[in-house]
């Protein structure tokens, strides 16, 4: 019997239907010598730390780094997963041959291999079904040419290294930074890929926040209704352009050069997943996750090919199928396909290139047409279909005309007078033949991706070299503008190139090898950062939150938030797939990196040799008797950071943190509006001090202090699970849990216990066997004990 494993039930149904397997069993299909069963994604996972060593269950700095000698696997915890795994194990054990039919990619391979290992069937012979669409024809061809399972060992090793390295780096970094810098009950989640992505967003937001607009002036002149600009560029002062303006006013403008060239703009390359996500975000505002979800659904319904691809080309052997596919697509896109001569298709190496196809070719429609689509799915399908159709259109031909002109000023007669001619330039664009761009003629420039855009049309008069005449020079003032915040399209682009900005198609392809994440994981990385409140969506932009910015400020180890470092790791994983890099060497590098994290976290988070710069004028801050003030106070700057804020003494160390990182590292017992609560002190760019409750930033509710701590000088603060001392970070262990022996302890009870040393007789406690009893709570040497009532 041959057992086929798919990644999800819907794919199992499709394969069963195609192979005429009609007998439905509990957890599998059976017939014609096959049993087809399925997973629900990752049914098998890496074990938790305490499953290797019970000591690792408790979070402590002493136990770090946590690195298992050998990773183990466990079944996912939910009942449905356990039941299905047992079915798979029974079928695998009895099988003569196993066929892996999970998604044809890194994660699909990992899902299968982990299950194969967990079921103890590693010695069983197995084959690999590798297909790029789920049409019946593709499935039949795939089963007719099954691959040897071990041919994909490189893919599995890369997936295994990715899984284990994420576990090691993520777990150790998260525990390290939570233990060192987290507030009570809070969690600082750090990931091998997510943290560098967060750092990119934080850096962009800082560039915008710190941007100072500068005035500039441009010299233009209007000649025969055409706008010419001065070739010397912008001026950073008004005097120079005014001097030139005075020199050329009233003198003739002469055309010195008229040059034209024809530009051929080829159709855009086909979509890979990242480009599809970027395009749908620009066109329709879809998130990366929404686009992937729609594309995956269209793939599972057999309307699109495999979406999780990083290729933008097709293979040579697909050429014969292009005409039949275009003929099929006429049903929905007859008007767009009509101009194409299907008997003389343009099949260039730019689109059909085996060397540029990795695991899967570009995303294209299949011959299985959808019925009436609506909503986001329709937008995704139409985008893929139009991009595919555009590949067979002729190029867009444009005529680019560059015109140079000049004005000869009078002879020099004073300081600042121009020497020689004042030169100007203008450029015009005319479309001779729109070619493929007719498919996008109704869209604005902002809706088109860069590969679908050309120069805006600008028609010039018929200039002749040597002609001259009057003109109207002018000065146009302006201000520099800040960088734009990331939207999903621009963030995906920067993730794809590991933090490097690039528009060139060839260079972009090279940088893809060192991207942040993979096409199939980038959407989930963005969603995880949003879920963890490190970034937020504001309309179409992605902005860092206070929590996200604070986390990045805490991480002293630049490599942990480095896009280039993570990009290098991704490149090595790709090489492991290709058997070009030793997986053991990769894991050794990851382990060495993790071992150094603890040492690097001891580095100062700020420059302790200086206080910092004034938020108002950027001059150095100096220490005074009552506060920390701006050194430029004689020039009128009035910034001062007082040495006591909200009842909290501000030490020099805390002032460094506020001036350099905008907030204190630790929380303090802040007194504000007759309340005392645990909060971090903050300083904004206007020089105003404030405080941030842990409730909003660390997801743990901190209320007013209910009493003084009986063990130290701290305050007893109400948190989610307990009444605890605000000085817990400094070693105070005073805690009254909110639930004791199944009874809820109210704030009033805790206050009485703290003020008098005991509560009254309390009813409603329950023993481990469920027997109710009454007792008093007493405070003995800072510990809560029970004084049992006598009958």
Regions from the PLM with identified roles:
Residues 1, 103-104, 184-187, 260-269, ...:
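Conserved short loop/turn motifs at secondary-structure junctions
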Residues 1-163, 167-169, 444, 482:
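Intrinsically disordered, low-complexity regulatory segments
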Residues 238-271, 277:
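Metal- or metallocofactor-binding catalytic centers and their adjacent structured scaffolds
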Residues 8, 414-416, 466:
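Glycine-biased, low-complexity coil/linker segments
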Residues 138-223, 260-264:
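C-terminal or mid-to-C-terminal helical accessory/interaction module adjacent to the motor/catalytic core
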């Amino acid at each position: 019997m041959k057992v086929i494993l798919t990644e999800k039930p819907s794919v199992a149904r499709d394969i069963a239907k195609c192979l005429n397997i009609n007998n439905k069993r509990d957890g599998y299909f059976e017939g014609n010598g096959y049993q087809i069963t399925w997973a629900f994604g990752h049914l098998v996972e890496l074990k938790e730390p305490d499953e290797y060593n019970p000591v690792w269950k408790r979070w402590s700095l002493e136990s770090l780094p946590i690195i298992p000698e050998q990773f183990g696997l466990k079944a996912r915890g939910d009942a449905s997963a356990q039941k299905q795994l047992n079915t798979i194990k029974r079928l695998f054990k009895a099988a003569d041959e196993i066929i892996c039919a999970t998604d044809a990619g890194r994660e699909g391979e990992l899902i299968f291999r982990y299950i194969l290992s967990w079921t103890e069937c590693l010695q069983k012979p197995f084959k690999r079904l590798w297909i790029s669409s789920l049409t019946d024809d593709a499935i039949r061809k795939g089963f007719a040419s099954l691959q040897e399972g071990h041919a994909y060992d490189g893919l599995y090793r890369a997936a295994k290294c990715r899984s284990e390295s994420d576990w090691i780096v993520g777990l150790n970094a998260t525990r390290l930074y939570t233990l060192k810098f987290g507030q009570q009950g809070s969690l600082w989640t750090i990931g091998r890929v997510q943290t560098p992505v967060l750092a990119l967003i934080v850096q962009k937001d800082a560039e915008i926040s710190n941007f100072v607009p500068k005035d500039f002036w441009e010299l233009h002149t209007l000649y025969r209704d055409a706008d010419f600009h001065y070739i010397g560029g912008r001026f950073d002062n008004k005097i120079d352009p005014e001097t030139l303006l005075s020199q050329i006013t009233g003198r003739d403008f002469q055309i010195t050069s008229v040059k034209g060239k024809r530009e051929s703009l080829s159709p855009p390359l086909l979509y890979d997943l990242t480009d599809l996500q970027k395009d749908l975000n620009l066109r329709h505002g879809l998130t990366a996750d929404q686009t992937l979800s729609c594309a995956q659904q269209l793939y599972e319904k057999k309307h699109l090919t495999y979406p999780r691809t990083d290729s933008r080309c097709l293979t040579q052997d697909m050429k014969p199928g292009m005409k039949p596919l275009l003929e099929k697509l006429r049903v929905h896109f007859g008007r767009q396909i009509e101009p194409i001569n299907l008997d003389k298709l343009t099949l260039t190496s730019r689109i059909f290139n085996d060397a540029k196809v990795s695991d899967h070719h570009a995303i294209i429609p299949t011959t299985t047409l959808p019925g009436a689509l609506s909503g986001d799915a329709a937008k995704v399908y139409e985008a893929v279909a139009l991009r595919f159709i555009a590949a067979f259109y002729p190029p867009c031909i444009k005529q680019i005309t560059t015109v140079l002109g000049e004005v000869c000023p009078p002879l020099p007669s004073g300081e600042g007078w121009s020497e020689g001619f004042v030169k100007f330039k203008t450029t015009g664009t005319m479309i001779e033949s729109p070619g493929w761009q007719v498919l996008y003629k109704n869209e604005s420039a902002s809706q088109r991706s860069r590969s679908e855009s050309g120069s805006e049309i600008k028609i010039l008069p018929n200039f002749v070299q040597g002609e001259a005449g009057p003109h109207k020079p002018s000065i146009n003032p302006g201000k520099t503008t800040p960088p734009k915040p990331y939207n999903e399209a621009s963030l995906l682009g920067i993730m794809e190139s590991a933090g490097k900005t690039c528009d060139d198609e060839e260079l972009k392809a090279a940088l893809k090898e060192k991207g942040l994440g993979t096409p199939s994981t980038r959407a989930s990385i963005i969603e995880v950062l949003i879920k963890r409140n490190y970034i937020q969506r504001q309309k179409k932009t992605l902005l860092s939150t206070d929590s996200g910015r604070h986390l990045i400020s805490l991480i002293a180890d630049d490599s942990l938030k480095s896009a280039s470092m993570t990009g290098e790791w991704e490149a090595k994983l790709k090489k492991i797939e290709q058997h070009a890099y030793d997986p053991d060497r990769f894991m050794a590098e990851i382990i060495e990196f993790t071992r150094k994290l603890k040492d690097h976290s001891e580095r100062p988070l700020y420059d302790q040799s200086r206080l910092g710069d004034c938020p108002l004028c950027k001059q150095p801050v100096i220490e005074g008797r009552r506060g920390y003030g701006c050194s430029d106070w004689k020039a009128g700057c009035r910034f001062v950071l007082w040495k006591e804020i909200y009842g909290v003494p501000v030490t020099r160390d805390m002032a460094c943190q506020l001036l350099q990182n905008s907030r204190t590292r630790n929380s303090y017992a802040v007194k504000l509006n007759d309340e005392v609560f645990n909060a971090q002190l903050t300083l904004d760019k206007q020089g105003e001090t404030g405080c941030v409750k842990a409730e909003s930033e660390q997801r743990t509710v901190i209320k007013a202090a209910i009493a003084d701590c009986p063990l130290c000088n701290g305050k007893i603060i109400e948190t989610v699970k307990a009444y605890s001392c605000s000085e817990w970070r400094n070693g105070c262990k005073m805690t009254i849990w909110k639930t004791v022996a199944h009874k809820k302890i109210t704030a009033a009870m805790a206050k009485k216990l703290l003020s008098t040393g005991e509560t009254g007789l309390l009813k409603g406690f329950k023993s481990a066997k469920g027997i109710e009893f009454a007792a008093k709570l007493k405070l003995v040497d800072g510990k809560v004990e029970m004084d049992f009532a006598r009958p």
